Amino acid sequence: MAKKVVALIKLALPAGKANPAPPVGPALGQHGVNIMAFCKEYNARTQDKVGLVIPVEISVFEDRSFTFILKTPPASVLIAKAAGIERGSGNPNKTKVGKITTAQLREIAETKLPDFNTKNVEAAMRIVEGTARNMGVTIAD
């Protein structure tokens, strides 16, 4: 018989840098999960993506064991990295802070495709383009 899931925890952590300090410790500790085991496994699975924020979905079972699924980094993080900016514009309609090419847009959309509710790359590109526009990043052809 399958183990019963007692909690589903969603966190966004820097790749390769999870530690027992907040937010990881309190989120996992209240469900009785071995925090260091999670941190070591998360850091090992994300060591090739250092510098990105990787969302993770942790399933905690009734025997206090856990499994986790790594998601793709947020589109805003990928756009900021491609545009070479630290953060988006505070006023995106007036102040443009960066520029990305259509090729970079397609690459980001293909990276995010598994997490989107579409299987069409063009639709994913439109979703990412909207995020870029809201960050004050323009799309160059």
Curated annotation (Swiss-Prot):
<dbReference type="InterPro" id="IPR036796">
    <property type="entry name" value="Ribosomal_uL11_N_sf"/>
</dbReference>
<dbReference type="InterPro" id="IPR006519">
    <property type="entry name" value="Ribosomal_uL11_bac-typ"/>
</dbReference>
<dbReference type="InterPro" id="IPR000911">
    <property type="entry name" value="Ribosomal_uL11"/>
</dbReference>
<keyword id="KW-0689">Ribosomal protein</keyword>
<comment type="function">
    <text>Forms part of the ribosomal stalk which helps the ribosome interact with GTP-bound translation factors.</text>
</comment>
<keyword id="KW-0699">rRNA-binding</keyword>
<dbReference type="InterPro" id="IPR020784">
    <property type="entry name" value="Ribosomal_uL11_N"/>
</dbReference>
<comment type="similarity">
    <text>Belongs to the universal ribosomal protein uL11 family.</text>
</comment>
<dbReference type="GO" id="GO:0070180">
    <property type="term" value="F:large ribosomal subunit rRNA binding"/>
</dbReference>
<dbReference type="InterPro" id="IPR020785">
    <property type="entry name" value="Ribosomal_uL11_CS"/>
</dbReference>
<dbReference type="InterPro" id="IPR020783">
    <property type="entry name" value="Ribosomal_uL11_C"/>
</dbReference>
<comment type="subunit">
    <text>Part of the ribosomal stalk of the 50S ribosomal subunit. Interacts with L10 and the large rRNA to form the base of the stalk. L10 forms an elongated spine to which L12 dimers bind in a sequential fashion forming a multimeric L10(L12)X complex.</text>
</comment>
<dbReference type="Pfam" id="PF00298">
    <property type="entry name" value="Ribosomal_L11"/>
</dbReference>
<keyword id="KW-0687">Ribonucleoprotein</keyword>
<keyword id="KW-0694">RNA-binding</keyword>
<dbReference type="InterPro" id="IPR036769">
    <property type="entry name" value="Ribosomal_uL11_C_sf"/>
</dbReference>
<protein>
    <recommendedName>
        <fullName>Large ribosomal subunit protein uL11</fullName>
    </recommendedName>
</protein>
<dbReference type="GO" id="GO:0022625">
    <property type="term" value="C:cytosolic large ribosomal subunit"/>
</dbReference>
<dbReference type="Pfam" id="PF03946">
    <property type="entry name" value="Ribosomal_L11_N"/>
</dbReference>
<keyword id="KW-0488">Methylation</keyword>
<dbReference type="GO" id="GO:0006412">
    <property type="term" value="P:translation"/>
</dbReference>
<dbReference type="GO" id="GO:0003735">
    <property type="term" value="F:structural constituent of ribosome"/>
</dbReference>
